[in-house]
From Swiss-Prot:
It comes from Jannaschia sp. (strain CCS1). The lineage of its organism: Bacteria, Pseudomonadati, Pseudomonadota, Alphaproteobacteria, Rhodobacterales. HAMAP family: 16SrRNA_methyltr_A (MF_00607). This is Ribosomal RNA small subunit methyltransferase A. It is found in: Cytoplasm. PROSITE patterns: RRNA_A_DIMETH, SAM_RNA_A_N6_MT. One of its GO terms (cellular component) is cytosol. It holds the Pfam family RrnaAD. CDD domains: AdoMet_MTases. It catalyses: adenosine(1518)/adenosine(1519) in 16S rRNA + 4 S-adenosyl-L-methionine = N(6)-dimethyladenosine(1518)/N(6)-dimethyladenosine(1519) in 16S rRNA + 4 S-adenosyl-L-homocysteine + 4 H(+). Specifically dimethylates two adjacent adenosines (A1518 and A1519) in the loop of a conserved hairpin near the 3'-end of 16S rRNA in the 30S particle. May play a critical role in biogenesis of 30S subunits. The keyword Methyltransferase applies.
Length: 289
């Protein structure tokens, strides 16, 4: 791909700055500007949108987002070695790129972006799932983001879109499908990255729902689902007994069989259970309905 921003190819950039991916930070650099541009386009129309990017590394996706017309990109990078590279991109797009040398897990990210907001990221593998759960469980409806376009390990992506009855169905599927409409929109082989990881990767696009598919409180639902799948081979009455002494009665009240296992329960069933558990699990600020 011929760069339209006047900056060198990414392989030249990392060579000039002596950059190499660090396993401790979960880094795998995506250096093909054709691929980073495609991921940016998968996020949809970016004009008049502020974008949060986590883990930009040498800035390939950052360049794609800006080239696609993002109103503003806030790039959160924990690795100080990448800051000089990102500063070069910032100089090409004055006023449109803000780089934060910070840990995304400790950041109040929404304060730095104006609505509408989208999150687009090649997430570091070691924090991707934790960040996703945080983005999926704010107290507000709709969430502070319009969409998420995120790269994960392929097995994580498959867990996000999994359906009841499958071995990959669990917490990520329930929270993702309660808050959004998630779809796998792109796959990438290991050789697309430097260094190549041992697994395939996939991009998942989440379109935020204006209201939950079924009424439930985010914190209560998260607790119930975590307990149920924490011992997924056990019957619900055993897996959830630590939440309430009368758990069998509550399961029946939610329309569930106490002898079912977590992987058999659809999203609607978990939301019904969360509602009947609100008096024993401290809810978040106000019930989400």
């Amino acid at each position: 791909m011929v760069a339209i921003d006047g900056l060198p190819p990414l392989r030249d950039v990392i060579a000039a700055h002596g950059l190499s991916a660090r396993k401790a930070l979960g880094q795998n650099f995506l250096l093909d500007l054709n691929l980073t541009a495609k991921i940016a386009r998968l996020a949809g129309d970016l004009t008049s949108v502020d974008v949060l990017e986590v883990g930009p590394g040498p800035g390939g996706l950052t360049r794609g987002l800006l080239a696609e017309g993002a109103r503003r990109v806030v790039a959160v990078e924990k690795d100080p070695r990448c800051l000089p590279v990102l500063a070069e991109i910032e100089a090409i797009y004055p006023g449109r790129l803000k780089v934060l040398n910070a840990d995304a897990l400790e950041l109040d990210w929404a304060a730095d972006l104006q609505a509408p907001r989208k999150i687009v990221a090649n997430l570091p593998y070691n924090v991707g799932t934790e960040l996703l759960v945080r983005w999926l469980t704010p107290a507000s409806w709709p969430p502070p983001w319009e969409s998420l376009t995120l790269m994960f390990q392929r097995e994580v992506a498959e867990r996000i879109v999994a359906q009841p009855g499958s071995k990959t169905y669990g917490r990520l599927a329930i929270l993702s499908q309660w808050r959004a409409d998630p779809r796998i929109v792109m796959g990438l082989p290991p050789e697309a990255f430097t260094p190549p990881p041992k697994v395939h990767s996939a991009v998942v696009h989440f379109t935020a729902l204006p209201a939950p598919r079924f009424p439930a409180d985010a914190r209560v639902l998260t607790r119930v689902v975590a307990a149920a799948f924490g011992q997924r081979r056990k019957m619900l009455r055993a897996a959830l007994k630590g939440l309430a002494p009368d758990i069998e009665d509550r399961l029946v009240a939610a329309g569930l069989k106490p002898t079912d296992r977590a992987e058999q329960v659809p999203l609607e069933g978990f939301c019904a259970l969360a509602r009947v558990m609100e008096d024993v699990i401290t809810p978040s600020h106000g019930r989400e309905a």
